[in-house]
Amino acid sequence: ELAAFTKGISMLIFIGLPVAYIGKLYNCAAALCGGKVLGIVPKTHIPNYGEFYEKRYFSPAPKGNASYPLWAEETTIFGTDQLFADINLSETKVACEICEDLWAGIPPSVRHTAAGATIVVNLSASDETVGKAEYRKTLLGAHSGKNVCAYVYADAGMGESTTDMVFAAHDLICENGALLAEAKPFGTGRAEAVLDLGRMQCERRRS
């Protein structure tokens, strides 16, 4: 239904969802555009420490890409090695990772940016603890600078909080080390920004 809703809309949209594949359950993001499911990206790093115990439910992403059946005879790509490109804008190459993937020692986005991704999208349910908002902001800025990319971070909102964890919709957009937009924690704002992908391509050629 969500894919059908995007028909006629020239916008790349990512949604989070659980996906069952070959007997295992994965925490995934689906890329939607123009009524199509362009790909499904599973989460690579599954946290199982502190307040996180995702391994009770989810398996880490398998290596490589595979075909995933959708409906009728239609299929899509399932895997982490995907870049979503705009044929009219050569600089636009979008990769996706999920929450803990960014906080890991070697995030999947390191591989994605090395393969040409200029924008990395992160669908996150990052809970709030003392000092975490500032650390999160610092982490995103450093990661986007180190990998010369734009990093778009969408966080779970207050309505998704439970008795165990609190979420604050701390959305962020960073570009090559600079913070472009921020939706403050526990607010009602949105993070929106215009990205200079041509400048990032120029920076990459210089490095």
Describe these PLM feature segments:
Residues E1-S207:
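Enzyme catalytic cores with a strong preference for nitrogen-chemistry domains
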